[in-house]
Design a protein with these regions (language model features):
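Local cysteine-cluster metal-coordination motifs and their immediate loop/turn environment
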Residues: 10-24
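Short amphipathic alpha-helical interaction segments
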Residues: 332-346
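Minor-groove-contacting beta-hairpin "wing" of winged helix-turn-helix DNA-binding domains
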Residues: 357-361
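Short, amphipathic alpha-helical interaction segments positioned at domain boundaries
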Residues: 363-378
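Auxiliary N-terminal substrate/complex-recognition segments of SAM-dependent methyltransferases
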Residues: 6, 340-342, 370
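C-terminal scaffold of the Radical SAM
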Residues: 2-6, 25-49, 53-332
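A short, conserved structural fragment
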Residues: 346-356
């Protein structure tokens, strides 16, 4: 294994579940100490498998990792560094909610080795935040970013497009205000209403409270133009970064670099096997206590699957993929309709070719799900 690997650690605890959340989380942290101990034991189980591999990214995701007390977080990171070989200059990312960020916590994260913080801002409009159960307000979000930027940390902010009550104007304002802070990375996600029964029911009952698909498309394109004018490059469907500030760990997923995952529901790609841990906390903890990984999925990836993944994941990146790889895969797949679809996407300006590489145009990114799903289903 030549490429440096990445390590993901899932910390599932939250004060409350947000209206749009589809991740594995728990609002009861009474078992947190036991869970952190299970993480350390799972790391031990993986130590021999990771022997000889080097890591250059550690991603503490959730859930709400910023809820973990600093002394426990420091111990966890020290345990991981003792089990896995991390390169100098490794990217250590922690996800945080704005309401958790204090000067004291920030300094503790830095002592733990955190160098990058991803903040769940989601919006800078109080009414929009309240509509989906966020616990912070706009002022609190800006205050948290200011505290983090003051320590020289690399900062990422998440925004959501399509929130209840959001207008094109309020979304534009959130993007512009985020650009004026010290962040060097911005992620914009479309609200997936179908993942929340309450939000989907509200959208059906009050469609006037939600931007239409066309309005979301226009707002997304405008946001990209705003970010570009402020020095951010659009490097992946949902992500913009200042030069050199791309999310190193997440890029591993899109380039099929080796990753290991610790914790409930964690996914990984290792030695061309896709694996995923069980999504139930009791099952996870009990399995690790018994000395075995709680795998709900463990299967090899065939050469054909790997080729398909390289295209599907690679097209998510603005650099795209070698045109020859796409053409070769289409020729080998034997789907009689796919070649015609492929030509249509190019003729319609969704895909562009330059320097022997095929990539989505900005408009193409908007319709990327349709295109990528076609590759998946062929």
């Amino acid at each position: 294994m030549t490429a440096a690997a990445g390590l993901y650690v899932h910390l599932p605890y939250c004060r409350s579940r947000c209206g749009y959340c589809a991740f594995v989380v728990s609002t009861d942290d009474s078992g947190r100490s036991e869970y952190l101990g299970a993480l350390a034991r799972e790391a031990t189980l993986l130590e021999s498998e990771a022997c000889g591999s080097r890591f250059d990214s550690l991603y503490l995701g959730g859930g709400t990792p910023s809820l973990v007390p600093p002394d426990e977080l420091v111990r966890l990171v020290e345990e991981l560094r003792g089990r896995f070989v991390f390169e100098d200059g490794s990217e250590v990312t922690l996800e945080a909610n704005p309401e958790d960020v204090t000067i004291e916590l920030r300094d503790a994260w830095i002592r733990a080795g955190v160098r990058r913080v991803s903040v769940g801002v989601q919006s800078l409009e109080d009414a929009e935040l309240s509509a989906v159960g966020r616990r912070h307000d706009a002022a609190g979000a800006l205050r948290s970013l200011d505290r983090l930027a003051g320590a020289g940390l690399s900062l990422s902010a998440d925004l959501i497009l399509g929130l209840p009550g959001q207008s094109a104007g309020t979304f534009r304002g959130s993007v512009e205000r985020i650009c004026a802070t010290g962040v060097d990375h911005v992620s914009i996600y479309l609200l997936e209403t179908e993942k929340s029964r309450a939000i989907e029911d509200d959208r059906r009952a009050h469609p006037d409270r939600y931007l239409s698909d066309d309005e979301q498309a226009d707002a997304w394109l405008e946001a990209g133009e705003t970010l570009a004018s402020r020095g951010f490059a659009h490097y992946e469907i949902s992500n913009w970064a200042r030069p050199g500030r791309e999310a190193r760990h997440n890029v591993k997923y899109w380039t099929r670099a080796p990753t290991l995952g610790l914790g409930v529901s964690a996914h990984e790609l290792w030695n061309e096997r896709r694996r995923a841990n069980a999504s139930g906390l009791p099952v996870y903890v009990a399995s690790v206590r018994e000395g075995r990984r709680p795998l709900a999925l463990d299967r090899p990836v065939s050469e054909g699957e790997a080729a398909r993944e390289r295209i599907i994941l690679g097209l998510r990146l603005s650099q795209g993929v070698p045109t020859a790889d796409v053409q070769s895969w289409i020729d080998e797949e034997g789907d009689p309709l796919l070649p015609g679809d492929y030509e249509d996407w190019r003729d319609e300006g969704l895909l562009a070719e330059k320097g022997g590489r095929l990539r989505f145009t900005e408009r193409g990114f908007l319709l990327s799900n349709e295109v990528l799903c076609r590759f998946v289903s062929s």
